[in-house]
Amino acid sequence: MRNNLPPYAVSDTNSRGRRIHEDPPIGRSQFQRDRDRVIHSTAFRRLEYKTQVFVNHEGDLFRTRLTHSLEVAQIGRSIARNLQLNEELVEAISLAHDLGHTPFGHAGQDALDNCMKAHGGFEHNLQSLRVVDVLEERYARFDGLNLCFETREGILKRATKSKAQALGELGERFLHGRSASLEAQLANLADEIAYNNHDVDDGVRSGLITQAQLEEIEIFARHLHQVKQHYPDIAGRRLVHETVRGMINTLATDLTTQSKVHIEAANPNSPDNVREMPTLVGFSDTIRQQQQELKRFLHKNLYKHYQVMRMSNKAHHIVEKLFSAFAAEPALLPPKYQHKFRDHGHQIIADYIAGMTDRYAIKEYRRMFAIIED
């Protein structure tokens, strides 16, 4: 990490620290330590077998939560460098932001949220925080990973007021309408850039959306035209890849340019000063509108495609059946979770299911409900 960060960037010296004090790391920054702890966590390894849109076994080349997190980190670090923000913090947040995601993407989250309605609901950002604060079991002195406040702040993108009240200092911004650090704001938008554009790539690869359909979307059509001008003979996968590449570059450049303008105008003098201001990291109005158009397109043509809806229906069924069985008879849980259920109730069932990979959830369903196992 550069030592000459501007005063509004988070650094080791202005960090609010860890919940449990530790001696400073040797040869690396506090946020490099956070990043390394995330990478070595069990939950991070599981992301390889948790999906974005397509169930893990549907195809080997589709993105998983792991590849998505790596892509978010790459985009975030590049923009952070141009904005003179703390790259290691952006990277740590980016790598950790999906640790609490359920199997089967958003379908799994929706199903688990429905199951948990009577018990406080389920939200993957809060679950990601729970993973790094409580569920990881690696260190002798504490549960979780004992990450810095600023990394945890970035993981927690949103929270209801009732949930925020239980989070102490971390939940204050949701109670008082404050912002997060610039690094947290950036990681959130790097996630958006990666998510939308890579779903375009996977959607075309799967055959569920076509290039012709995408040409109706302004941002895609413009970059497609530019690619064809530069490479008249390009076609197929390379054409789509170059188009998506151009879109990502445009979004990153726009985000950098607009954010610099906002930061220079606001002139914050510390991370805490940033937190008292409106959000400073953001797109131009034009790009924001084009992003929204792309989101609407993906929702209508990819996420609501009948084949994806069939996969989502299966995911709902698996999650709901597993939850109902464990809630009706906690003795069906593995012994480790049975002991915890006595003290923490249905949250432990949510922890168990949310920690499953796609493959493990399918296997557990078969073990529970198949008359004859494969």
UniProtKB/Swiss-Prot annotation:
GO terms for molecular function: dGTPase activity. SUPFAM superfamilies: HD-domain/PDEase-like. Pfam families: HD (PF01966), HD_assoc (PF13286). The keyword Hydrolase applies. Disulfide bonds: none annotated. Residues 65-196 form the HD domain. InterPro entries: dGTPase (IPR006261), dGTPase-like (IPR050135), dNTPase_2 (IPR023023), HD/PDEase_dom (IPR003607), HD_domain (IPR006674), PHydrolase_assoc_dom (IPR026875). It comes from the Bacteria. One of its GO terms (biological process) is dGTP catabolic process. Residues 1-28 are annotated as: Disordered. PANTHER family: DEOXYGUANOSINETRIPHOSPHATE TRIPHOSPHOHYDROLASE-LIKE PROTEIN, DEOXYNUCLEOSIDE TRIPHOSPHATE TRIPHOSPHOHYDROLASE. Belongs to the dGTPase family. Type 2 subfamily. This is Deoxyguanosinetriphosphate triphosphohydrolase-like protein. It comes from Nitrosomonas eutropha (strain DSM 101675 / C91 / Nm57).
